[in-house]
């Protein structure tokens, strides 16, 4: 269900994202970050599936899923590309590791430094603080709040795009 929601909102967000990035409603030049998150979620699902398999050779499809997720992220021009998919996987695999914050911080730094054309993504590193402080418990979980957070992404991009087109 989570993947279906990501897919739905990736589709809904694409037109405003294209408008923001290219000034056109349709473009294959860039794809929004929800596609990256969707690919990352599918790779994480494959990793969970592989944990249930007793034989090493039975886990090969999960390894293939990592490669396919990376390639689709790169070829699909998703925000942050295949490296973003791997970053999602890093956060997933280290979620229960003691000292995870250090691994995630180093991973994010290396990602920002080596895998993005501009170093401006380094400014996103303070966003790790709320992630590190997350206690693992679900917060308020009614549908209005849940879909409000999902809707925020395409709505704010659309507003910024319209402002950029007509005000600035």
Show where each model-derived region lies.
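Alpha-helical transmembrane segments and their immediate juxtamembrane cytosolic regions
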Residues: 1-168
